[in-house]
C-alpha cells in the first residue's frame, strides 16, 4: 500500500539567494533516485525556509516490485570443449551465479547462442532505500562552498540540527550528515512552539504552521509578500517596486512573513532616487514605492519575520535604521556636486583598471577615441560621443559611487546634468553600461551606443590581448560585454564590421598587448556568443552553425543570414538541396587538383549538366545585386529553384568521368553551384 513520505532537514540559516535552487535540486535529485530505484509515486513537492529543506511525496510505493534479471554467459562455442564438457569459462560463470552449467538455460538469437541464467530478484522495501537516496540527493546539491561544524569532518552548506524521515506514521531510522532521524521538528525562533513531535507525514506542513508558526511552503510565502506589498503600496497611493530577485531573497529570509509600511523624510527625495533605492533594496531589503509617474515616494515596504502586537515599534525601528543611510546619500550628493565631474579626470590616474593595461585614465583615453571612431561610423555626433567618453568614468572618483558602488553611471548622469553638460552626453554616462543583463534595455541614443560599445570593446580587446580569455570564471564579464556589443549592433541595425572595430581598439593599446592573435581570438569569441543568444531566440543549432561556418563578421549581416536560412529550411526544396550540398562538399574535398574559374560550355555533354550549368550561370548573374543588398531570403528562395536540375544532374551524370577534361569541368560546375549557397551559409550542415 502506498503511503505519503516526508523528509525534513533542519539547519542553521541557509543562504537566502540559494534557497530556491537548493530546494529544487533536492527534489530533482531525490525524484531521479526514486525513478532509478523503480519506486513509483504520485508527485513530489519541496518546501524551504531559512532553517529547513523538506520534501513530501504523495503515495510513495512501499517497496520495489520483484523482477527477473537475465545474466548472459559465455557463447556456446566457448562454453564447451570438443568433447562437450564445460570449459573453465563456463564453470566460472555458473559458479559466480550460484548454479551449475547444467542448470543454465540457453539464449538463441540471430547472432548466436549463449548460456543464460534467469534470476528472480526480490524488490526491497522502500524504508530500506530512502535514507541512502536522500543522502545522495543532498550530496548532489549545488553548493559552491561547504562548511564543517563541531569536531566532525562532515560538510554541508550549513550545520544540520534535525532530521525527520516518515513513511506514513512510521519513523524511518537512519543518519544523514551526522544527524539521526527523529520525530522532532523545530518551529519558529520567536513564535509558536520551538520544537514539537510529528506523528505522520500526512500532518506536514499544516502542523508546522499551526504549532510552529512556520510557513514551509515557499511559494505561499512569496504570494503573501507580493499581495501584501501591493496592498500596502496602494494604501499610500503608490506602486511597489517588486523586483523578482529581491522578492525571492526576502521570501528566503522569513518563515512567517508580515508585510509592513514605513516612511522617511520628504527632504531625502532631493537626492537622486537611484541612490536612495540602492540603499533601500541592496542594504535593507526594502521595497521602494513610486507614484503613477514613477517618482519615488517617501515610503517603503518591508517584511518582518514576526507577528507583533505592537508593529509600530518594528516600523519605527526600521525607519531609524534606514535614516542614517539616506542621510549619508544626501551628504555625499551635496558634497560631490561642489566639484565639476571633469575635475575628477586626473584622479583616474590613481585607479588601476588592470595592471598590464594601465589606469582607468588610460582606459578613459582609449574609450574617448574609440567612441569618436564608432560615432563616425554610425552617424552619431562625434564631439558629444568623445565628451561622454572623457567623462564616462569620472563618477568612480565621487564619494557617492565609492560608498554605493551600484550607482556608477547613473550618478555620473546626475552630476553631468548639474554641471550643465549636454543632455545626450549626460545620458550616455548612465547608458554606457547597457545592456547590463540578458533582456536589459539598450542605449537609447547613438551617442550612448557609441560609448557603450567603446567601453565594452576596450575591455574585450585588452583582456584578450594579455592572454586572459575567460575559462570557467569571467571576472571582467567578457561574455556579457561581447553579447552587449552584438545586441546593440544587431538590434539597432548598425552596419559595423567586427574586424574594423577590433583593429581600431587594438591600435589604441600601443605595445601593451602580448597576444599576437588578439584580433582573431576576440572575433571568434564574439561569434561564439551568437550561438547561445540565437538558440535562446528559438533558432536551431544547425541553422546557426550553417551561418557561422561562413564567419560573417558584420553582426547585422549575421542576423539577416540566420533569418534567411531559417525561412529556407521551411521550403520543400531545402532537405534535398542540403543533402546535395553535402554530397558536393564531399566530392570536392576528395579532389586535390586545381579547378577552373569558369565552366567550359563546349565540354557539357549530358542534357542534365547543360540544364544545371545554364541555371547556375543565370542565377549567379541575377543574384549578384541581391547578395550585395544583403537580401539573403530572396536569394535562397531563388536558389531553391535548383532542386530539380540538381537532382537530375546526380541521377544522370557521372561526375568522376574517366575523361579528365570532363571530370574537371563537372567539378567546376559543382563548385560554382556550391559557392552560390556558400555566399550565404553552408546549408550542408542543416539537419533533417
Swiss-Prot record:
- Does the keyword field hold Ligase? yes
In the record, biological process GO terms are:
arginyl-tRNA aminoacylation; glycyl-tRNA aminoacylation
Name under which the protein is recorded? Glycine--tRNA ligase beta subunit
Sorted alphabetically, which Pfam families does this protein's record hold?
DALR_1 (PF05746), tRNA_synt_2f (PF02092)
Q: What class of enzyme is it?
A: ligase
What organism is the protein native to? Answer: Aliivibrio salmonicida (strain LFI1238) (Vibrio salmonicida (strain LFI1238))
Gene (UniProt):
glyS
Q: Which protein family is named in the record? A: Belongs to the class-II aminoacyl-tRNA synthetase family.
Q: Which PROSITE patterns match?
A: AA_TRNA_LIGASE_II_GLYAB
Q: Name one GO cellular component term.
A: cytosol
